Each structure stands twice: as structure tokens, then as C-alpha cells.
A protein has these predicted regions:
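Basic/polar N-terminal segments that are highly enriched at the extreme N-terminus
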Residues: 1-9, 132
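A solvent-exposed, acidic/Ser-Thr-rich amphipathic alpha-helical stretch
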Residues: 7-8, 12-14, 20, 27-77
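Hydrophobic/aromatic beta-strand elements that line small-molecule binding cavities or substrate pockets
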Residues: 56, 69-75, 87-89, 103-109
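Short, cysteine-centered beta-strand-loop-beta hairpins and adjacent loop/turn segments enriched
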Residues: 62, 90-99
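Residue-level signal for tight coil/turn positions that link beta-strands
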Residues: 78-80, 112
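Short beta-strand edge/turn micro-motifs at domain boundaries
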Residues: 101-132
Length: 132
């Protein structure tokens, strides 16, 4: 696979675009960062941009309107960049004063000249140490 950027650079750039879209515009702008046939796996499974936009709009409507994303790991596998991230969302409205922590994975695929998420999983919850 030919990449002008390293997997880490691609992942950090994607996370920054996701943060900007979510923090500025919410669900519609964020859904555009997914491939047309992408799948989002969270509390429910959403397939395609329209369903993903609806799922994200529900989260946004609950007050989780600001997010910060930290890329933990990124690697190229085949034509994809696999990304592991941690996120913190801050609430407003019904969730004012609360912070939601979680982890997510993205399988990023190059669509035309843009890296988009082909599959995204998100798990809410505080960090859990690994058993030794």
C-alpha cells in the first residue's frame, strides 16, 4: 500500500477532523467522515451514512457535544489503517458537568483522496487496567 503519511499521521489527522466536525457541527458533518457503506458499532449497529448520522444525532441530542480524541495505536494492514483511540466527551444540557470516557477503533480506508472510516466501534466506560 502506498501512503504519503505514516499510519500514525493518518490516524491523528482523522481524529482531528472527527473532533472538528463533532465540536463544530455535530452529527451531519461527522457522518461525512464515514465511507458510504461504513458500519458503526456501539449500543446499536448503524450501517451506512444515513443510519450513522441518526445514531450520532441521538448521542449529540443527549448533550455530548464536545469531544477530545487521543490516538493510542495505528497500523497499516492491507489497504487499511487500523486505529485505536481513547476519547472524552463533555456534556451540556441534560449531561452538563458530566464527562463520558471511552475507547474506539476505526478501520480507515482511502476513498478517492480522503481517509474515511469503513468501520467504527465505540465502547463507553472508564479505563480498565489489564489483568496481570
Amino acid at each position: 500500500m502506498h501512503m504519503e503519511q505514516t499510519p500514525q499521521e493518518i490516524a491523528v489527522d482523522y481524529a482531528a477532523r472527527w473532533e472538528r466536525a463533532w465540536n463544530s457541527h455535530g452529527a451531519l458533518a461527522t457522518a461525512q467522515l464515514y465511507a458510504p457503506d461504513s458500519v458503526l458499532v456501539g449500543a446499536a449497529i448503524a450501517a451506512g451514512r444515513r443510519e450513522i448520522e441518526r445514531a450520532l444525532a441521538f448521542i449529540f441530542s443527549q448533550g455530548w457535544q464536545r469531544i477530545s480524541i487521543k490516538v493510542v495505536n495505528a497500523r497499516a494492514v492491507g489497504g487499511l489503517v487500523l486505529v485505536v483511540s481513547e476519547f472524552s466527551a463533555t456534556g451540556s444540557g441534560p449531561t452538563a458537568g458530566k464527562i463520558l470516557h471511552g475507547k474506539s477503533t476505526h478501520a480507515l480506508a482511502r476513498v478517492d483522496d480522503t481517509w474515511l472510516s469503513a468501520m467504527h466501534t465505540a465502547i463507553n466506560g472508564a479505563p480498565t487496567p489489564l489483568a496481570t
